[in-house]
């Protein structure tokens, strides 16, 4: 007997480890379903995800504050469509090509180092010398002062001009989005799929999301501290403190790299148990281009329905956030507060609420409702919430615009402007959307994914997880941009009635898609077979299946 065979004979089987993980007698044991031998491999990955999520949460709120301070809320949709979407697609597809000959682990390490260098350079160089790198930051605002462009019908172009003039702020917005998409959503979970078996993934992924939401809570308190320090200090001290925040994010990126390298060298590849023949590690990679992804999506009604659900959610969230962020900026001006400080305070409150409530839902029996009650009980919650949420946000925006005398599609009786109430409703609805993202949209989507034949699963997930989320945001931003052009304004709240109409139509289609998916899911579970992917054209998919 060789040394390796002797070592394996001392290891428990995967089923024995699974039984130990599921047999917790204490509260923590029942919540954190992790066997004793799995604790190191789970703990290090949880720490990595915590730091990745913390950087993403802080950078996301910092970028929103910087954009509202130096640019305009109406600039965000243009950045999403013209900058973030194409750059994100290019980076993701480039990484997929690199992964043909390179491991996910190496790419993850490289990205952490690159972002670490970038964050440090941004805090020390770009923020210190942006007056040299950029044109006069007041140049564009002077062009648009005194409503000169309103009479020319070009007021909406300020949202395009400001990101070009203040390009360092646009770069910060782009980098925060790329960190969230590439490092957080793509590479980390691709790395976990290479390390864990399928049974481990089913237990660990919800727990990883818990640690991600703990990071969200910590970042919420961090943003409150940043806001407090910024309000108390002078302009020079506030600028120095913000530089320090970016440098600390860079240091955190390097810490992630060091923890990951130690984990890879000493823990990740040590055998924990004897893997059963029925189990396998999820190493399948989805190597698809954009056009190929669209063609594959169009060949299956099931994938079209799942993709539409993802797109509908992203469009709805994007449109309500555009209105909400504009309202925050307007309310800050109304009460004489500095816009970036005000945004930090509101965003930190949202983070705390989302993190705490998401953890409660993820640790409760809510994710198991699909199994116990049925698919519709979970999947139908987001579109129902969307209808009431959009009616609240856009309805209040329409009333406030009427009170100010701004033209909308329908006339309303002036009842007095109440931006505080509009902001409060917006914060509640945005919080609800983000909570439902973790606890309902993702849970129902993953339940469907687990019923798809493994031969197609990786390719289909590459479509609705890798492409459709950003595509939905781009569509929502495009709708916002077109409405700004139509109303000759940078305030999308003037289009509240048309926004409500568009989202209502999208949500109705969302509901029909959920009902269709529920029927397919229930049929699959009752017959205990793979879900019917409902092919439109069988021959191309049969060929793809043979290739797989």
From Swiss-Prot:
List, alphabetically, the GO terms of the cellular component aspect.
plasma membrane
Keyword Plastid in record: no
Organism domain of life: Eukaryota
Q: Name one GO molecular function term.
A: ATP binding
Q: Which Pfam families does this chain map to?
A: TLC
User: Is Nucleotide-binding given among the entry's keywords?
Assistant: yes
All disulfide bonds of the chain are none
The residues that cross the membrane are 39-59, 75-95, 107-127, 149-169, 171-191, 204-224, 239-259, 302-322, 350-370, 374-394, 410-430, 494-514
The alphabetized UniProt keywords are: ATP-binding, Cell membrane, Glycoprotein, Membrane, Nucleotide-binding, Transmembrane, Transmembrane helix, Transport
State where the protein is found.
Cell membrane
Glycosylation sites per record: 101, 400, 406, 488
Regarding the membrane, this protein is recorded as: Multi-pass membrane protein
Q: What is its main location?
A: membrane
Please identify the protein, giving its name as recorded.
Answer: ADP,ATP carrier protein 1
What's the source species for this entry? Paranosema grylli
Name the encoding gene, please: ANC1
């Amino acid at each position: 007997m060789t040394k390796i065979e002797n070592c394996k004979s001392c290891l428990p089987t995967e089923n024995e480890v699974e039984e130990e993980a599921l047999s917790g007698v204490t509260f923590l044991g029942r919540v954190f379903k992790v066997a004793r031998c799995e604790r190191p491999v789970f703990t290090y990955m949880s720490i990595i995800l915590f730091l990745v999520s913390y950087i993403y949460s802080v950078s996301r709120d910092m970028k929103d504050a910087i954009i509202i301070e130096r640019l305009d809320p109406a600039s965000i949709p243009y950045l999403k469509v013209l900058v973030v979407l194409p750059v994100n697609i290019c980076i993701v597809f480039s990484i997929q090509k690199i992964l043909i000959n390179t491991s996910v682990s190496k790419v993850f390490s490289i990205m952490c180092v690159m972002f670490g260098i970038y964050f440090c350079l941004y805090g020390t160089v770009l923020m210190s010398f942006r007056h040299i790198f950029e044109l006069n930051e007041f140049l564009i605002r002077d062009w648009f002062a005194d409503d000169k462009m309103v009479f020319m019908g070009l007021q909406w172009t300020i949202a395009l001009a400001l990101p070009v003039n203040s390009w360092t702020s646009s770069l910060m917005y782009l980098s925060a989005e790329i960190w969230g998409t590439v490092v957080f959503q793509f590479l980390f979970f691709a790395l976990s799929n290479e390390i864990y078996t399928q049974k481990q993934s089913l237990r660990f992924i919800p727990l990883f999301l818990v640690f991600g939401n703990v990071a969200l809570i910590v970042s919420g308190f961090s943003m409150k501290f940043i806001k407090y320090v910024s309000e108390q200090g002078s302009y020079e001290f506030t600028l120095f403190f913000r530089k320090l925040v970016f440098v600390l994010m860079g240091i955190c990126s390097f810490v992630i790299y060091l923890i990951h390298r130690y984990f890879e060298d000493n823990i990740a590849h040590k055998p924990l148990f004897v893997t059963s023949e029925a189990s396998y590690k999820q190493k399948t990679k989805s190597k698809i281009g954009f056009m190929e992804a669209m063609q594959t999506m169009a060949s299956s009604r099931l994938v079209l329905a799942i993709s539409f659900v993802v797109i509908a959610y992203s469009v709805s969230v994007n449109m309500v956030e555009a209105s909400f962020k504009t309202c925050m900026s307007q309310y800050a001006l109304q009460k004489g507060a500095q816009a970036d400080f005000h945004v930090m305070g509101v965003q930190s409150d949202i983070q705390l609420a989302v993190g705490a409530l998401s953890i409660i839902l993820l640790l409760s029996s809510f994710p198991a409702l699909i199994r116990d009650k049925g698919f519709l009980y979970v999947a139908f919650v987001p579109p129902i919430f969307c209808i009431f949420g959009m009616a609240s946000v856009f309805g209040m925006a329409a009333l406030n615009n009427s009170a100010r005398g701004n033209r909308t599609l329908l006339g309303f009786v002036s009842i007095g402007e109440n931006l505080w109430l509009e902001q409060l409703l917006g914060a509640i609805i945005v919080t609800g959307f983000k909570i439902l993202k973790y606890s309902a949209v993702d849970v129902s989507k993953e339940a469907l994914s687990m019923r798809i034949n493994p031969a197609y699963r990786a390719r289909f997930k590459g479509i609705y997880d890798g492409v459709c989320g950003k595509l939905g945001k781009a569509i929502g931003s495009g709708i916002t941009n077109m409405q700004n052009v139509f109303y000759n304004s940078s305030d999308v709240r003037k289009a509240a009635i048309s926004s409500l109409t568009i989202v209502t139509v999208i949500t109705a289609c969302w509901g029909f898609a959920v009902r269709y998916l529920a029927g397919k899911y229930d049929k699959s579970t009752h017959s205990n077979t793979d879900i019917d992917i409902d092919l439109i054209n069988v021959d191309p998919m049969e060929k793809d299946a043979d290739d797989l």
